[in-house]
């Protein structure tokens, strides 16, 4: 078996994904005791892992540094990459939502200002609804933007809604459901087809058996 390099997202999604790889027999002990390391070799296999920021997973896969990647659907929607999206892993499930302070009127005809970390997704969503909005990109906590009057509403990923609630915001619209996706480099799918599909097929069966 030729070596397969898998790019994973650091943080919350990583904790959801590691158990899936363990369930299909891939050793992830180094990943679970990583310290500050970012590159790991799975014991007794030709599989290695790299840990990078979510937005970089698709970039590493697109350019062939990683053969396989696991990343949230939000990253793929916001950043168009030349990769294959192969499998919905069904973990890390969240929703894109429009949220604001209780006095926000989503049916108002005046042009709205929307704060978000995801301008591409937000622009497409409101364009499809036929609404003209001004989008302000915020890199930090977007929840404060409507509270301070910078914008009318925000678009953000909501998992439990606790952060919104703590800041006095409510969800006005649920836009899209998102989850972790397995992606593959296009060239690698030709040159390492058997190795890649051996992982994808077993992973898919594991997911289906767990439903």
Swiss-Prot record:
GO terms for biological process: L-histidine biosynthetic process. GO terms for molecular function: ATP binding; ATP phosphoribosyltransferase activity. The keyword ATP-binding applies. Pathway: Amino-acid biosynthesis; L-histidine biosynthesis; L-histidine from 5-phospho-alpha-D-ribose 1-diphosphate: step 1/9. It is found in: Cytoplasm. The keyword Cytoplasm applies. Its EC number is 2.4.2.17. Keywords: Amino-acid biosynthesis, ATP-binding, Cytoplasm, Glycosyltransferase, Histidine biosynthesis, Nucleotide-binding, Transferase. InterPro entries: ATP_PRibTrfase_cat, ATP_PRibTrfase_HisG, ATP_PRibTrfase_HisG_short. One of its GO terms (cellular component) is cytoplasm. It catalyses: 1-(5-phospho-beta-D-ribosyl)-ATP + diphosphate = 5-phospho-alpha-D-ribose 1-diphosphate + ATP. Belongs to the ATP phosphoribosyltransferase family. Short subfamily. NCBIfam families: hisG. Heteromultimer composed of HisG and HisZ subunits. Lacks the C-terminal regulatory region which is replaced by HisZ. Catalyzes the condensation of ATP and 5-phosphoribose 1-diphosphate to form N'-(5'-phosphoribosyl)-ATP (PR-ATP). Has a crucial role in the pathway because the rate of histidine biosynthesis seems to be controlled primarily by regulation of HisG enzymatic activity. This is ATP phosphoribosyltransferase. It comes from Bacillus cereus (strain ATCC 10987 / NRS 248). The lineage of its organism: Bacteria, Bacillati, Bacillota, Bacilli, Bacillales. The gene is hisG.
């Amino acid at each position: 078996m030729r070596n397969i390099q898998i790019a994973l997202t650091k943080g919350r999604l990583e904790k959801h994904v590691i158990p899936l790889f363990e369930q299909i027999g891939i050793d992830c002990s180094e990943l679970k005791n990583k310290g500050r390391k970012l590159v790991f070799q799975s014991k007794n296999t030709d599989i290695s892992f790299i840990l990078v920021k979510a937005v970089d997973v698709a970039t590493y896969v697109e350019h062939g540094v990683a053969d396989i990647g696991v990343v949230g659907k939000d990253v793929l929607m916001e950043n168009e990459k030349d990769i294959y999206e192969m499998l919905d892993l069904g973990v890390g499930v969240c929703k894109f939502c429009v949220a604001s302070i209780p006095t926000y009127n989503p049916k108002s005809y005046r042009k709205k200002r929307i704060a978000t970390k995801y301008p591409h997704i937000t622009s497409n969503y409101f364009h499809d609804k036929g609404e003209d909005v001004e989008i302000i990109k915020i890199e930090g906590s977007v929840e404060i933007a409507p509270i301070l009057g910078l914008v009318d509403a925000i678009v953000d990923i909501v998992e439990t809604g606790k952060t919104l609630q703590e800041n006095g915001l409510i969800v006005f619209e649920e836009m899209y459901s998102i989850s972790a996706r397995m992606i593959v480099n296009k060239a690698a799918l030709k040159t390492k087809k058997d190795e890649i599909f051996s992982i994808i097929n077993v992973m898919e069966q594991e997911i289906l058996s767990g439903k």
